[in-house]
Amino acid sequence: MEDYRMVLLDIDYVTVDEVPVIRLFGKDKSGGNEPIIAHDRSFRPYIYAIPTDLDECLRELEELELEKLEVKEMRDLGRPTEVIRIEFRHPQDVPKIRDRIRDLESVRDIREHDIPFYRRYLIDKSIVPMEELEFQGVEVDSAPSVTTDVRTVEVTGRVQSTGSGAHGLDILSFDIEVRNPHGMPDPEKDEIVMIGVAGNMGYESVISTAGDHLDFVEVVEDERELLERFAEIVIDKKPDILVGYNSDNFDFPYITRRAAILGAELDLGWDGSKIRTMRRGFANATAIKGTVHVDLYPVMRRYMNLDRYTLERVYQELFGEEKIDLPGDRLWEYWDRDELRDELFRYSLDDVVATHRIAEKILPLNLELTRLVGQPLFDISRMATGQQAEWFLVRKAYQYGELVPNKPSQSDFSSRRGRRAVGGYVKEPEKGLHENIVQFDFRSLYPSIIISKNISPDTLTDDEESECYVAPEYGYRFRKSPRGFVPSVIGEILSERVRIKEEMKGSDDPMERKILNVQQEALKRLANTMYGVYGYSRFRWYSMECAEAITAWGRDYIKKTIKTAEEFGFHTVYADTDGFYATYRG
């Protein structure tokens, strides 16, 4: 038995001898940064049942021959609640049996039955992706779920996070170019003519069937060899992160289809598995076991407000530089004409270099959000900000002993969709040129309102006797004590952000300040997301009353502040939500 330290990059589970086995993919920090797959057989799935009659519920559940039953005291929207923790043999048993449990007469409700097994493991074990893990284990010669020579370890002791983040990650970017004489590329007939790759591991090249006179071009025999050479590079380098731009919806689906037509092998996974494309909402998501695939296109759509999100436009906005651009509908012409082909090669290389530069600038924030939310980077990079906030709260709920509310039913969702909270107060800007302007704004207005007014579904009450904060306009009442679940969590976020900003002030190290700035920016984004998701129809902690109360207090504060300013001789020329501009007239 040995001690291991690894940076956790990816996680899933497989079934071995009818037993669910969690697989942890990472780089072994105690052994030369080698890839390693750790198998943990100790964890089992579970859900909670809220009984109407505890003894009767236990009796009915025992008849179902479940793996294990345990009575626990938890909180349900702040109320002490006795629940039964129901353990299962396998994750696939949960959807098979949960409806039978829900339908028992002695069961009022079931909870946390829709949390994926690998996410449950991360939450319960307090393990954070992109951080170092420590565990004891025994290296095995082979494992049924691994067909490569990547080291495999059977976990024999507790797996725990060290709290140390991942540094010096190996990042590889890629991009394909297609000969498209008929317009939109068609993988059934239009060949891939080059694949560019660039990384921080000293690799920068374009693979193609031509161009041997250029020193950055690696020439192969045909398209099949082109695809297999790309696969060979990914398998050999085993980057921690593989980045593309629109690679979920274009590059990888195209590569996969061309490989199938040509009979090329694309077993890129650390375990020997093929790349896998799945649906995530309205888009595709392509996964490689072990290596984290990040598509920067949806990431940039979340973080930037642009007229269009082409690679060229995003690159220019981030760096103030123009990258090489060619007309997409004429790329085939640049390939077919000898005098133009070199331009296409340089365009291909510029694409992957630009993608890599964008990744180096954007990924630190995503890595920090991964550590905060506690879910894999693969998922975080594809989550809307509201989903990130929800999974952050799910993780915190486990720590607080709170039951996680269920997702809304279709009927609940439909009834919620029509409701919209009134937004912040806006005074349209006065036309003209204004001088001697002063600006006033509230710092973290909505998060501060949530904390100061204790706005949370578990503090909302109709009780006229309780000591409450009463929302303007609506009259919603929120108990002053105890502190609600969501205000408590947001309070933690803001306190940690203040601590980090103080640490930044005291640091003279530019690199440390840069890291700390990314951390506080991630906390800021998370805190500012919280108020908005109260009114999101699919949010587990949905409460239109909370959403309306927050913006009502916001409007009240800004209007009162403007009125006070005007009493002192200021004239407001523009106001929006959490601040205003004014001129002084005396």
UniProtKB/Swiss-Prot annotation:
In some Methanobacteriaceae the PolB protein is split over 2 genes. InterPro entries: DNA-dir_DNA_pol_B (IPR006172), DNA-dir_DNA_pol_B_CS (IPR017964), DNA-dir_DNA_pol_B_exonuc (IPR006133), DNA-dir_DNA_pol_B_multi_dom (IPR006134), DNA/RNA_pol_sf (IPR043502), DNA_pol_palm_dom_sf (IPR023211), DNA_pol_type-B (IPR050240), RNaseH-like_sf (IPR012337). Keywords: DNA replication, DNA-binding, DNA-directed DNA polymerase, Exonuclease, Hydrolase, Nuclease, Nucleotidyltransferase, Transferase. It holds the Pfam family DNA_pol_B_exo1. Belongs to the DNA polymerase type-B family. Optimum temperature for DNA polymerase is 60 degrees Celsius, functional between 60 and 80 degrees Celsius. Exonuclease activity is higher at 70 than 50 degrees Celsius. Formed of a complex between PolB1 and PolB2; the exonuclease activity is associated with subunit 1. Probably binds replication protein A (RPA). One of its GO terms (biological process) is DNA-templated DNA replication. GO terms for molecular function: DNA binding; DNA-directed DNA polymerase activity; exonuclease activity; nucleotide binding. It is an enzyme of class 2 (transferase). CDD domains: DNA_polB_Kod1_like_exo. This is DNA polymerase PolB subunit 1. DNA polymerase is inhibited by replication protein A (RPA), while 3'-5' exonuclease activity is not. Polymerase inhibition can be overcome by replication factor C (RFC) and PCNA. Its EC number is 2.7.7.7. In addition to polymerase activity, this DNA polymerase exhibits 3'-5' exonuclease activity. It catalyses: DNA(n) + a 2'-deoxyribonucleoside 5'-triphosphate = DNA(n+1) + diphosphate.
